[in-house]
Design a protein with these regions (language model features):
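N-terminal "arm"/small-domain region of PLP-dependent enzymes with the aminotransferase-like
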Residues: 1-75, 86-90, 185, 217-219, ...
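Generic structural signal for small/hydrophobic residues in well-ordered secondary structure
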Residues: 19, 37, 84, 101, ...
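Conserved glycine-rich beta-strand-loop-beta hairpin in the small C-terminal domain of fold type I
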Residues: 36, 310-324, 336-352
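Conserved core of the PLP fold type I
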Residues: 65-217, 222, 228-244, 248, ...
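PLP-dependent enzyme catalytic core of the Aspartate aminotransferase-like
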Residues: 82, 86, 90, 95, ...
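Conserved core segment of the aminotransferase class I/II
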Residues: 127-132, 151, 243-317, 329-330
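Short, conserved charged micro-motifs
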Residues: 356-362, 402-406
Length: 417
């Protein structure tokens, strides 16, 4: 079978996807005693499951015929778009209209849509016949799923962040703004904030610098708020979502407890949102309508805010505190380990400051102990010469406290010289 150039690109299994496949195959066979600290799934919180089930049952009873038994608008259902504009206008004092909103089947699809529209070969001043403009990640590491967004080869470029030590066992990344400013091929800037895998949120001065660059280059800055304000608030944010002519804000319900239903939405200026709606119409027609009804109910009733405040935020705060306490207690003092500073998030991101350390070697060692983590290199696109990428790994905070406790003990044992 012959694949097109685009087909060859999109049919390739990314590094992290191969890890996820390895986890799925390993855990599906043999005893069920694996400790999976590599998962990207949000936690299955019973109270969150019950709340979404209740909202879904209400939508089924009242909206099934109108939502599931006929097509709908590609921008999103009128009820959800109205709920979104009302929620954000009231919360942040914005003046959104439906023309500022695009609802899509998951934030991954919205990011893919924006990448296809605003980066790549074309008529943009930064485009060239050989390569076109790029999707630029201003801070690498960042969400590994971004690396599969572009239909053309080498379409995603990461700007390596500088790890800055803090105290004995902490560090924090700093933006490489000089290297970012030197890029003449920016088609779109893309950043998760708070970030995956680090939980790091941009501060006001950093955000001003990124928005200023987007304005000067006349390109969009897409901010992925999957972990931040106003939901799910798993990791604390330092600034509210910015409303700016050159910013596309992307929000999802996945980390609020609804990952399987693939509902997300983008908010931005009409110049960006209108082509995104057209792209969605041509590619997916529209997002699932019954779940749009569910989310509209959650927003307008205030039940989503209560779920986040009373259930989701406390869960991850507790797991973060437990993980930090355990790592401090059991990780060997002889190992130069550092945890990315933060007060929340779905993950712990580690840097082993030792040139002899290799992330995939740790992965294989822990796999023999029936523990899964994620090697750090998969979060660094297009930076093979950066040795830091092989000195990191990610641990999920979504598992049960029992799994976390035993898994962290085995990680400590694997790190001992």
């Amino acid at each position: 079978m012959a694949l097109s150039l685009i087909g060859s690109k999109m049919a390739t299994l990314s590094g992290l996807r191969s890890i996820m496949e390895d986890i799925a195959v390993s855990t599906a066979s043999g005893p069920s005693d694996w400790l999976n600290l590599g998962i990207g799934n949000p936690a299955s919180i019973p109270e969150a499951i019950a709340e979404w089930r209740s909202l879904t049952e209400e939508a089924l009873a009242e909206d099934f015929a109108s939502a599931s038994c006929q097509y709908g608008p590609s921008r999103g259902s009128a009820a959800l778009v109205e709920a979104i504009t009302g929620y954000f206008n009231e919360r942040y004092g914005w003046s959104l209209t439906p023309r500022n909103v695009a609802v899509g089947p998951g934030s991954q699809m919205l990011c893919f849509t924006a990448a296809a529209l605003f980066a790549g070969p074309g008529r943009h001043p930064g485009s060239t016949a050989t390569g076109g403009t790029k999707v630029i990640l201003p801070m690498a590491p960042d969400y590994t799923g971004y690396q599969g967004l572009c239909l053309h080869p080498d379409g995603v470029v990461g700007i390596p962040a500088a790890p800055v030590p803090e105290g004995t066992h902490r560090f924090r990344y700093a933006f490489g703004f000089p290297a970012l400013e030197q890029r003449q091929d920016i088609g779109m800037l893309l950043l998760s904030s708070p970030g995956n895998p680090t939980g790091r949120a941009v501060d006001a001065s950093e955000l001003d610098a990124l928005v200023g660059l987007a304005r000067r280059r006349d390109v969009p800055l897409l901010l992925d708020h999957a972990y931040g304000e106003p939901f799910p608030r798993i990791a604390p944010t330092l600034t509210p979502p910015p409303l700016d002519e050159h910013v596309i804000n992307c929000f999802t319900l996945s980390k609020a407890g609804l990952p399987g239903e693939r509902i997300a939405f983008a908010i931005g200026a009409e110049r960006w949102i209108t082509p995104m709606v057209s792209f969605l119409a041509n590619s997916a027609l529209h997002a699932p309508q019954l779940q749009q009804s569910v989310v509209a109910r959650a927003l307008t009733s205030g039940r989503l805010d209560r779920l986040i405040t009373q259930t989701v935020v406390p869960f991850y705060q507790e797991h973060r505190r437990l993980a930090e306490k355990l790592f401090e207690e059991v990780l060997p003092e002889s190992v130069p380990w550092r945890l990315h500073s933060g007060d929340g998030g779905m993950f712990c991101w580690f840097w082993i400051d030792d040139d002899r350390f290799d992330d995939t070697a740790l992965y294989e060692r822990l796999k023999r102990d029936r523990v899964f983590i994620v090697p750090g290199r998969h979060f660094f696109p297009d930076t093979p010469a950066n040795p830091h990428r092989t000195h990191c790994f990610r641990v999920s905070l979504s598992p049960t406290t029992e799994t976390l406790t035993e898994g962290i003990a085995r990680i400590a044992n694997a790190l001992r010289p």
